[in-house]
């Protein structure tokens, strides 16, 4: 049986004036429905060093090798828009990581581990964090 190849999950970040526009790329061979995750970042380049990443799950969430899964969720309102989001996956990353591309992000409550749910829909919002 041929070993299944897992395409890397990449986040491409384009900077434009005072905001970032990001696109998360899913492996072509996985998932259902063909909906690609997008990241929209509202961030003032002159201030906050940290931003919060909230995985969005419009119809569920994505597990590498398993595709889209049903999951618990809550409503999150950001910039007057309401999104579906996982309750338990907010993470904190340094804004400088965005410029280099996101390979891994570190959960705020688990500094020694990496967030494995990189294929989720992500929403990044500007926040002042401790």
Regions inferred by a protein language model and the residue ranges of each:
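Mature extracytoplasmic/luminal segments of secretory-pathway proteins
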Residues: 18-19, 84
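Residue-level detector of bioactive/disordered segments in secreted/extracellular proteins
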Residues: 23-24, 49, 89
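An N-terminal domain-cap segment
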Residues: 22-32
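C-terminal terminal-subdomain/extension
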Residues: 5, 74-130
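Compact nucleic-acid interaction/catalytic patches
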Residues: 30-76
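Mixed-charge, Lys/Arg-rich low-complexity intrinsically disordered regions
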Residues: 1-16
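Short Pro/Gly-enriched beta-strand edge/turn motifs at strand-loop
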Residues: 20-23, 71
